[in-house]
Amino acid sequence: MLEAAFMTGLERNADIVHMATYAPLFAHVEGWQWRPDMIWFDNLNSVRTTSYYVQQLYAQNKGTNVLPLTMNKKNVTGAEGQNGLFASAVYDKDKNELIVKVANTSATIQPISLNFEGLKKQDVLSDGRCIKLRSIDLDKDNTLEQPFAIVPQETPVSIEGNVFTTELEPTTFAVYKFTKK
């Protein structure tokens, strides 16, 4: 989850951070130099790690414009009083979607309220979807024996007007997507 939290900062500062890279990408299960690695393999199999899925969620949910996102008038950077929450928001003008990414790095459930201010009066947000990546056990990862132990799960979500409220489970990375009609 810390990787997801870090990447909210990259996205919030997209005017300065133009690219990021991930290394090392591959690791053999019987011989590696360091962790983390994105994809583990042996002679017959490969497995995607949670790091892979975090990177994938960012790559598949990038926007064209970074939006301001604040909590108590401050960027959501896990600062004191923000309860381990890190977040970023983007607008994808090609898909007409508002996308909010939130990482809860704390060990407690956190209430979330997304208030989409500044929309035109005729703009209506459709019910959206949430894609979550989570594990209560911070030491758990996908393995060759359990390749799908931690994978993104998608669920529909409902929004009332321009406000979406929910609770985010501990050690969870969530991507919320709403289409502007």
Model-derived regions: residue spans:
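A structural signal for short hydrophobic beta-strand segments in well-ordered beta-sheet cores
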Residues: 89-91, 157
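C-terminal beta-sandwich/jelly-roll accessory domains of carbohydrate-active enzymes
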Residues: 74-84, 103-181
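Aromatic/acidic polysaccharide-binding cleft in carbohydrate-active enzymes
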Residues: 1-87
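C-terminal catalytic subdomain
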Residues: 44-47, 58, 84, 93-106, ...
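Alpha-helix capping/termination and helix-coil
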Residues: 11-17, 59-66, 93-95, 106-110, ...
